[in-house]
Amino acid sequence: MILQNFFCFWLGYRASGYEPLEKEDGALILVNHQSFLDPLLVGLPLHRPISFLARESLFDVPVVGWILRKTHVMAINQEAPSTASLRETIRALHHGFLVGIFPEGTRTPNGALSEFKPGFAAIVRRARRPIYPVGIAGAFQALPIKSWFLKPTRVRIVFGKPITVEELEQFSRRGHDAALIALVESRIVACCEAAEIWRTSGRPPTTEK
């Protein structure tokens, strides 16, 4: 509650469209990656935790690796997820947990959406769980790369309409990864655009993205 109050005051934090996730029995949350704040910002309006995936190399960084392990973050190679990491992720989903993934694999260097890494497609194929696209706007301005000071600026989060298991069925076999990635990217882009409009104009989303 303290953290939520701080973000609402300092960043004018607002989120939209997250309510369906409160009752979702296991789902993937795919988000654009703007800053180190992103896992906190995405999870803030929810009354349940999100287990985010982070690149394996971060677990070797002193202090950072310890924090990641203590906050239930799971390690993954974005280019080619190992069998063990895939199994752990899918087990969490099948036990009803929310799992967050940054398809870009790393934070944006300039605020724009970066190219998606293909590794998340393998998780989507095997998990058979809905995908919730999420767009963040303003976090890059609040805490860009190499910055250690949180700047007071508006941050908006838009949770989009889920991509259902039925919709994902057509991508269940290998060879369809490019089409799957394109679909996910288009949904995240729509959420990012809605979040940016909300951030700059003050107009909240009127329809699900």
Predicted feature locations:
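Non-catalytic C-terminal accessory region of glycerolipid acyltransferases
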Residues: 84-209
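Membrane-interface helix-loop junction between the first two transmembrane segments
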Residues: 14-24
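Secondary-structure boundary/capping positions in well-ordered alpha/beta enzyme cores
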Residues: 13, 48-49, 74, 96, ...
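Short amphipathic alpha-helical segments and helix-helix/interface helices
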Residues: 3, 42, 120-121
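Short gly/ser/thr-rich secondary-structure transition/capping motifs
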Residues: 8-16, 140-142
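N-terminal nucleotide/polyanion-binding subdomain common to many enzyme families
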Residues: 1-7
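Catalytic core of membrane glycerolipid acyltransferases/transacylases, capturing the structured
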Residues: 8-9, 22-80, 88
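Residues at the C-termini of beta-strands that transition into short coil/loop
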Residues: 19, 56, 77, 135, ...
